[in-house]
Amino acid sequence: MRFTPLFLLAAVAIASPAPDLNARHELTRRQASESCPIGYCTQNGGTTGGAAGDTVTVTNLADLTEAAESDGPLTIIVSGSISGSAKIRVASDKTIFGESGSSITGIGFYIRRVSNVIMRNLKISKVDADNGDAIGIDASSNVWVDHCDLSGDLSGGKDDLDGLVDISHGAEWITVSNTYFHDHWKGSLIGHSDNNEDEDLGHLHVTYANNYWYNVYSRTPLIRFATVHIINNYWDSLIDTGVNCRMDAQVLIQSSAFHNCPDRAIFFADSDYTGYAVVDDVDLGGSSNSVPEGTLTPSSLPYAAITALGSGQVASVIPGTAGQKL
């Protein structure tokens, strides 16, 4: 039997998806096993998540909850769309990684009094306030949030939903990188109360690197007591306010830009004491910085330098790289 060239091409086209799919699965597993390479989560022995354990794939809320709350190291790959109304209490030594195109709706992740957790390539939306934050990090250490797409719903009341990434109660060695915060009332909070100095002061070391903030009302982020490095962030079309530095926080903001934002890009409000900021190569886009100069400088950071894109480049780069892009 003779096969025409057209038939052979068709056969190749039909056969090719399987190798491509296998390659995609292999890439997902490799990315899900990666350790945090950037910012404060490289400290204190580093952040490896579930790399020392097995890998499982989950497609529903029950299996996701069971895996995330289990003892021992485990990498959890989220496949497809999972929705519900729940707060998942993530245990230590976990990586939760979203496959390309996966999504989680209405489910919050509570990382409380644990260590060594990675939340990566997840698309999380519309978490009701009863289920906490999209990602809440409370009294925990070594947490990496990377390449996540986090959003809410501005059509409801301001308190119907809580924060997208909130970090509190002396949490330590946290990096939030390559993440897309959008369409929400409350972006990200560090330090939950002006009255929590005894627990928070000297802790709350957080890096925000390469993040995109779009159409967020406030808390981008709000910072109390903490030591925070913000680099290569792009804020676009904020609704009310930008970076709120309060209660003796020390903040370093580098290589970042604001566009189409209200006047208060970097500011202090609503506490008895101001925070402080060193602002280096930041395009305020016509907005203002009213925070006193601080003492946190690049040379005082304990981790490897993060390459600065430059304030003139973040607008063209960060929206294309932040979010569920792995």
From Swiss-Prot:
It comes from the Eukaryota. Its cofactor is Ca(2+). The active site is at 219. Binds 1 Ca(2+) ion per subunit. Optimum pH is 8.5. It is found in: Secreted. Pathway: Glycan metabolism; pectin degradation; 2-dehydro-3-deoxy-D-gluconate from pectin: step 2/5. InterPro entries: Pec_lyase (IPR002022), Pectin_lyas_fold (IPR012334), Pectin_lyase_fold/virulence (IPR011050), PEL (IPR045032). Optimum temperature is 37 degrees Celsius. GO terms for biological process: cell wall organization; pectin catabolic process. It catalyses: Eliminative cleavage of (1->4)-alpha-D-galacturonan to give oligosaccharides with 4-deoxy-alpha-D-galact-4-enuronosyl groups at their non-reducing ends. Pfam families: Pectate_lyase_4 (PF00544). SUPFAM superfamilies: Pectin lyase-like. GO terms for molecular function: metal ion binding; pectate lyase activity. One of its GO terms (cellular component) is extracellular region. Its EC number is 4.2.2.2. Residues 1-15 form the signal peptide. Keywords: Calcium, Carbohydrate metabolism, Cell wall biogenesis/degradation, Lyase, Metal-binding, Polysaccharide degradation, Secreted, Signal. The keyword tRNA processing does not apply. Ca(2+) binds at residues 133, 162, 166. The keyword Transferase does not apply. Belongs to the polysaccharide lyase 1 family. Pectinolytic enzyme consist of four classes of enzymes: pectin lyase, polygalacturonase, pectin methylesterase and rhamnogalacturonase. Among pectinolytic enzymes, pectin lyase is the most important in depolymerization of pectin, since it cleaves internal glycosidic bonds of highly methylated pectins. This is Pectate lyase plyB. It comes from Emericella nidulans (strain FGSC A4 / ATCC 38163 / CBS 112.46 / NRRL 194 / M139) (Aspergillus nidulans).
